[in-house]
Design a protein with these regions (language model features):
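Localized chelating/binding microdomains
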Residues: 14, 37, 62
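Hydrophobic anchor at the beta1->P-loop junction of P-loop NTPases
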Residues: 57
Length: 191
């Protein structure tokens, strides 16, 4: 028959095929130490309970922005394991391009049983406030490809997320990482 099919089941050509998966996160990123240090500097105060941090990661498609954010968040959770519980909500805004869908995905990340339907944006944000305050943990929201959401829904959600602790006397419950391949300042009105 066909000899080229003899390779099927004969063994792997690639020793670690998981490394080619879309969601694969390596143990370490090689050659990106300066960028990792810069991101760590932006989050230097996150070990204090009253602190929230913000960062924008930009770069061309395929430059490693998403894997940088994922490794940073994973490493930060490990680093602060005995000091502060860190929860991560990573939302791809290309797949969830409206503000409502983004907040639903954030809520589902921190509470898988949260209802997906029947709540207004105000009710969703109230649920997010309650969930972040109920736990003594800190939530890092990563909005990947945020420019898609900004074009479709505007910047109101960013404003709401940045102001989520406004009545908490400085208690930081939410930090924000925005990832984009374009300069977001051209899209958002105020940041």
């Amino acid at each position: 028959m066909s000899s080229y099919l003899d390779r099927i089941g004969a063994g792997f050509i690639i020793s670690n095929p998981e490394a080619l998966d879309f969601d694969f996160v390596p143990n370490e990123i090689v050659g990106r130490e300066a960028v990792q240090s810069e991101l760590a500097n932006k989050f230097a105060s996150i070990d204090r309970h009253e602190s929230s941090c913000r960062a924008i990661i930009t770069g061309p498609v395929g430059s490693g922005k998403t894997v940088l954010a994922k490794t940073f968040c994973r490493d930060l959770q490990r680093h602060l394991a005995n000091k502060r519980e860190i929860m991560i909500a990573h939302v791809n805004c290309r797949n969830a391009s409206t503000s409502t869908r983004v907040v639903q995905r954030i809520l589902h990340e921190i509470d898988p049983g949260h209802p997906d339907r029947g709540l207004s944006m105000g009710e969703l944000l109230l649920s997010l406030r309650k969930l972040t305050r109920k736990n003594s943990s800190h939530l890092i929201v990563v909005l990947d490809e945020v420019d898609h959401m900004l074009r479709k829904s505007g910047d109101d959600l960013l404003y709401q997320l940045l102001r989520i602790d406004e009545d908490q006397q400085g208690k930081g419950t939410l930090s924000l990482i925005l990832i984009t391949s374009i300069i977001v300042f051209l899209i958002i009105n105020v940041f």
